[in-house]
Amino acid sequence: MSATAVTADGLEEIEVDVVAVWKEGYVYENRGDTSVEQKITMTKGMKNLNSETKTLTATHTVGRTLKVGDPFEIGSVEVSYSFSHQESQVSMTQTEVYSSQVIEHTVTIPPTSKFTRWKLNADVGGTDIEYMYLIDEVTPISVTQTIPQVIRSRAKILVGRQIHLGTTAVRIKHAERQEYMTVIERKKWPAATLGKSNLFKFVLFEDSSGTRIKTLNTMYPGYEWAYSSDQGGVYFDESSDNPKQRWALSKALPLRHGDVVTFMNKYFTNSGLCYDDGPATNVYCLDKREDKWILEVVNP
């Protein structure tokens, strides 16, 4: 199950079920007749924090929301659990998750006693979050311990807003050049070329023959469907069954804000949408080329 809330910057917040488990974080048996002090060092938060941004990459699926390789951020994590006949709840904010805080302190263990530190770990899309919470337990060595039990574990994650085919307006940005696909007039046709403006909008459609790219900024009404000419220039024509208007997308549905994709033409099957420094425009469909493009959701 998941719940969704739209946020700014092309992202949406989705609540998903995640895996959480109690583990032995530290165990010490003091079989002597005097107390013993032990120094414990632990890291609270993300175990392997190796990014300057909050963007993570999923290494396994999370329901129907995250697939392997998908980018996401962790907004918060919440776990309810039972221990010693009581139910409790603990949560971590985004700041706490990403802080990766190292904590060191000393505990005193009485004689003939066993010290156990239970740590609550959560896994969100392959990212391990350590010491969400801890429980220190001191028992006689011979006593069988009661392991805390997770009741429910949920996380709020931030992912790119879903691109709904046929309705969601997007910008199409060249991944390497960081310029947007725009529409200008060439040879009395609407034509695609790269530019700095992010005001040009497109809608992706899909039919049985492939993906279609519709511009919302044509200067000739009805001439709005991207196709490859025989010479490789990309223009916008009236709607038809022409396979030159169909494209094969490199990424499976659903598409999301921030997805990086390629567009291969369905007629010129070895040719892909790409940058090329032409005489008047620079968006082409050329043989053995498949440049990467970033899809950005246009805020309503």
Curated annotation (Swiss-Prot):
- Where is this protein chiefly located? secreted
Q: What positions are marked as the site Crucial for binding sphingomyelin and inducing hemolysis?
A: 22, 247, 293
Site (described: Crucial for binding sphingomyelin and important for inducing hemolysis): 189
Keywords for the protein's UniProt record, in alphabetical order: Antibiotic, Antimicrobial, Cytolysis, Disulfide bond, Hemolysis, Ion transport, Membrane, Secreted, Target cell membrane, Target membrane, Toxin, Transmembrane, Transport
Task: Establish whether keyword Heme is in the entry.
Answer: no
The entry's cellular-component GO terms read: extracellular region; membrane; other organism cell membrane
**Renumbered residue ranges of the record's region N-terminal cap domain:** 12-35, 110-158
Q: Where are the annotated segments for Beta-hairpin domain?
A: 36-109
Disulfide bonds, which pairs? 274-285
Q: Where in the cell is it found?
A: Secreted; Target cell membrane
Q: Which residue ranges does the record annotate as region C-terminal receptor-binding domain?
A: 159-299
**According to its UniProt record, in which tissues is this protein expressed?**
Expressed by coelomocytes.
* UniProt-listed CDD domains: PFM_lysenin-like (cd20225)
| Binding-site list for an N-(acyl)-sphingosylphosphocholine | 187, 229, 235, 284
What's a single GO BP term from this record? monoatomic ion transport
Q: Which GO terms describe its molecular function?
A: toxin activity
Similarity comment text for this entry = Belongs to the lysenin family.
Q: What does this protein do?
A: Pore-forming toxin that specifically binds sphingomyelin in the plasma membrane of various cells. Has antibacterial and hemolytic activity.
> What is its quaternary makeup?
Binds to sphingomyelin as a monomer by using its C-terminal domain. Forms a nonamer when sphingomyelin/LRP-3 ratio is lower than ca 500. Oligomerization, but not binding, is influenced by the fluidity of sphingomyelin.
Name of the protein: Lysenin-related protein 3
Query: In which organism is this protein found?
Result: Eisenia fetida (Red wiggler worm)
